[in-house]
Amino acid sequence: ERETAQSFDTMCEDIYSGRLDYGIIPISNGRDGRLPVFYELINRYELKIVLACSVGADEGEKTLFALAGKSIPYPEMPFGEPTSLELFVTPGGGQSLTEMFRAAETCGMELQRIDSFGFSSVGEGVTFSPVFSAEGAEIGTFLLYMTAVFPQYTPIGIYRMIR
């Protein structure tokens, strides 16, 4: 397992440095849910999710794999119309996650899930990672809102989900 983690770390570093355009990493599975060690790599190497695919296993469990790159090709979206938007958000200064959820709903998005992480590189407090369904939504408008109201946010994925 340690060798596998080092291999993923090397791959992510290669994407960050430009030696690779993309890499595939697991981001969640049916047994453990979100996989924090891989989100730590996404955070550390400032990677972006550009495509996701759910793959079934023999036992019926599914693993979600992400195609990760250095940037989000928005609004061009060469991998198809986006169906999901994923962020890292560290609220502060009286900001409310409820306000963010209302803005997302106004822009045509729906919260699918939210997790929290304690990334040391982001600073004080907890970083939340909401995933919104974004098919047909006003993603650009929502990101403009986030820039104005939540300066401590990072889009980590605008992607199409392949099932």
Briefly describe each language-model feature range.
Residues 1-163:
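Domain-level signature for soluble enzymes in the chorismate/prephenate branch of the shikimate pathway
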